[in-house]
Amino acid sequence: MIQQETRLKVADNSGAREVLTIKVLGGSGRKTANIGDVIVVSVKNATPGGVVKKGEVVKAVVVRTKSGVRRNDGSYIKFDENACVIIRDDKGPRGTRIFGPVARELREGNFMKIVSLAPEVL
């Protein structure tokens, strides 16, 4: 579960390394985000020469959470870290590569480009 002020790792090559959650999008008063939800983030740490600069406010989609998500068959999937992918307005990734596994729940949110670029879909 991701809420305001949560720091996440960035799982793409857009240039950002770490981001801070500003807002969870999707309804008034929504407090937490899970895998597949869109959030507004501020870049706290970035690589030099990247597409995204430090201090920039961008949208991102959550791809991994420590708290995990419950599947319809009753199983849970949890990850070792909280991670996101920075996206454009058309839900496509700003970077050209995705690092690490992503959850299958991203297909339901129409993030097919992220799913196709990911090395592993769990």
Swiss-Prot record:
Keyword Ribosomal protein among UniProt keywords: yes
GO CC terms: cytosolic large ribosomal subunit
SUPFAM superfamilies: Ribosomal protein L14 (SSF50193)
SMART domains cross-referenced by the UniProt entry: Ribosomal_L14 (SM01374)
Family matches, as PROSITE patterns: RIBOSOMAL_L14 (PS00049)
Keyword rRNA-binding: yes
GO aspect biological process, one term: translation
Keywords: Ribonucleoprotein, Ribosomal protein, RNA-binding, rRNA-binding
Molecular-function GO term, any one: structural constituent of ribosome
Family: Belongs to the universal ribosomal protein uL14 family.
Record's subunit section: Part of the 50S ribosomal subunit. Forms a cluster with proteins L3 and L19. In the 70S ribosome, L14 and L19 interact and together make contacts with the 16S rRNA in bridges B5 and B8.
Role of this protein: Binds to 23S rRNA. Forms part of two intersubunit bridges in the 70S ribosome.
Protein name per its UniProtKB record: Large ribosomal subunit protein uL14
Source organism phylogeny: Bacteria, Bacillati, Bacillota, Bacilli, Bacillales
Gene: rplN
